[in-house]
Amino acid sequence: MGIYDIFDDESARSISGMSIDEMAKKYGTPVIIYSRARIVSNIRRIREAYENRVRMLYSVKANDNPRIIEIMHQESIGSDSASPMEIMMSIFSGIPPEDILYSPNNASEYDLNFALDRGIAINFNTFTQYRKMREKPERISFRINPGFGMGEFAGTTTGGARTKFGIDPDAAILAYRKAREDGIREFGIHMMIGSNNRDHVKIAEAYSNFFRIADRIGREAGVSFQFADVGGGLGIPYVQGENELDIAALGSAVLKEFDRYHFGDLVLEPGRYLVGDAGIIVGTVNDVHNGFAGTDIGMNLNIRPALYGARHTIIPVGERVEGEKITVTGQICENTDRIGDTAWRLSEGDRIMVLDAGAYVYSMSSRYNGRPRPPEIMIMEDGKDVMIRRREDFSDFIATVV
């Protein structure tokens, strides 16, 4: 899984035979382009690594375009949803309620009962959330904070001290006991410790610790788990030199450890790993001055660099000529509106690409500074381009005004 794998060859001029430059001319810029073939390849790579013994739930937060969720459904993948709207997007895209796991945090009674009324299993972030329920669901899970976290950035580390996620193992024992006393008979257990992890040894160790903790919780609470959900967080490289996740080695190690226990299904919640490297942003350089390349790709579209300090590979469309390092910026009135640096020579009018933009880009975008969101285009396996979301216009800005 390399950062250029979405393209037909190292020239990075086409995807599935479709010219990137021609796509920019056809749809304008900025535009987000996805490869369906790449998404499917990523799905099947996980399946092969886990010997078809894993149940996958797509992390909708990574990219909530219904046409992408439809691909997941076509590939027999369920939904990991974090809000009522993600639940509705999943159902709209064909995923049945029984294949959805709702994992909210700080949920309102409305949020929780929304899932309950649709027969969707709830993964509770706290015991107090469970106690809010109007009625008790048939199936529940609790999110465990195992006492450790692991993520690319502090802001994407979701386990351990000083995080708002999950309950500690001792509290979980009491929570499962109470749920059992309430008559619930179907249980799962869940963990999510952080995002964009690429060290298969450390990931496998974290999963092993989770299985051990889950086994103790089950024994002491007197419940058996129909599934053990290790969450998502499987990472991809964003720039040259970053290591790739050895998914085959991870799958082998995890299955070996999982087989020591009796948890029912092993569940994964991949998002970034499935769609992250399957998307690119194509933009235009509008101005070059003082070491900055001013483009139409800003933090309104890709907030990750400003939010986390995340890096993306940025390359010209077409010929690449080495130059001095230049900082790529957008059109937003903030000095944090920086997408990253590149050493390729850029001139006014050039097309550029921001790679690995399939996850946490459009789904985290905004209309800040009155900038409409761009169209999203899917390139099919046969090379045909399909618009799966149009470019926004003024009517979208005032659609909710009353």
Swiss-Prot record:
GO MF term list: diaminopimelate decarboxylase activity; pyridoxal phosphate binding
UniProt catalytic activity: meso-2,6-diaminopimelate + H(+) = L-lysine + CO2
Pathway(s) the chain acts in: Amino-acid biosynthesis; L-lysine biosynthesis via DAP pathway; L-lysine from DL-2,6-diaminopimelate: step 1/1
Disulfide bonds: none
InterPro entries registered for this protein in UniProt: Ala_racemase/Decarboxylase_C, DAP_deCOOHase_LysA, De-COase2_C, De-COase2_N, Orn/DAP/Arg_de-COase, PLP-binding_barrel
Documented EC number(s): 4.1.1.20
Modified residues (N6-(pyridoxal phosphate)lysine): K61
Record GO biological process: lysine biosynthetic process via diaminopimelate
Subunit and partners: Homodimer.
Family of this protein: Belongs to the Orn/Lys/Arg decarboxylase class-II family. LysA subfamily.
Protein name: Diaminopimelate decarboxylase
Gene that this polypeptide is encoded by: lysA
